[in-house]
Amino acid sequence: SIKNFYLTHKFISNLIDNYRSEKINKIISFNTKKKLNNLRILHITNFNERLDGRLFFNTGRRINNGFIRLGHSVLGFSDRDIQKYYKSFQDFKGAKTLNDKLKKTCYNYKPDIIILGHADLISPEQIDELKNDYPNVKIGQWFLDPLNKKGPDFERNKDRILNKINSVDATFLTTSPSALNFMPKDKCFYIPNPSDKSFETLNNFHKSCNVDVFFALSHGVHRGVLKYGKTDDRVNFVNKLIRLTPNAKFDVYGINNIQPIWADHYFKTIENAKMGLNLSRGDAIKYYSSDRIAQLFGNGLLTFLDEKTYLNDLFSNDEAVFYKDIQDLSEKILK
């Protein structure tokens, strides 16, 4: 009857809209329901293309290699390089182009997982938009910088890691989450600095090396050279250690106006060292280390670790040397 007639223009229009939305969502999520051994992973981090290979062994490339060895497809998205290359008068910071390029990349690649590493240029709002467009995608972030209150750039690093914490499904830190009272414990996990057999190839334990102890620092991997007037507590520590241990032969860089070393020069230098000092900026905190730990262990240098890092939970006394203080370290170097 006319009274019970329901096939109005509005009803049919809503029906078409719902059908269209259902089909579009299926198209968007197509290719995201896969077996775990064949995933598409979009890895957003700084691959340092503009540095001409100086950081060819950086953590982002190590993680890429690990995913590929596990049988996954990996697409690298170098956010800082893209932002730098696409700056213009119309897009002064390059942010608009970066976000547009990310959306187009996701549309074409249809990732199962999006991984962000120090991707500060990607906003939480952009991540939320991608999650809305691709509801089946899982998103995680990794973070390598120190997060202890007495360490360098604490407030800045804290803000960086918390910036997207509510937009990602998981966060991976090189500091134990149990040592950080500001991090939600339910979706934060410890990740060690990765070593890679294609980068760490030296096997120094099989060689007769001329240098006893190697140590290198820098004033920032992107800067490359020492910054005038910058102070670093590790300089005082290492200089004191050298004075306390006159019978050991040290090879140090980034200290006393000796410039940092990079790329192939770095590996050629540590190839001649028996032992390596794993010394990170700031006070020791549970499990934290800079990525030098992977380079020292991975290349077969006997590595010294501050026992206040609690890394003896992960390494035995047969795998590393743990020291209590600088005097203890000096004595153990000479043993």
Name each model feature, range by range.
Residues 111, 135-138, 274:
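Loop/turn elements at helix/coil->beta-strand transitions in domains of secreted/extracellular proteins
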Residues 88-104, 143-146:
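Conserved nucleotide-sugar donor-binding subdomain of glycosyltransferases
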Residues 106-114:
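Proline-aspartate-enriched helix->loop->beta-strand connector
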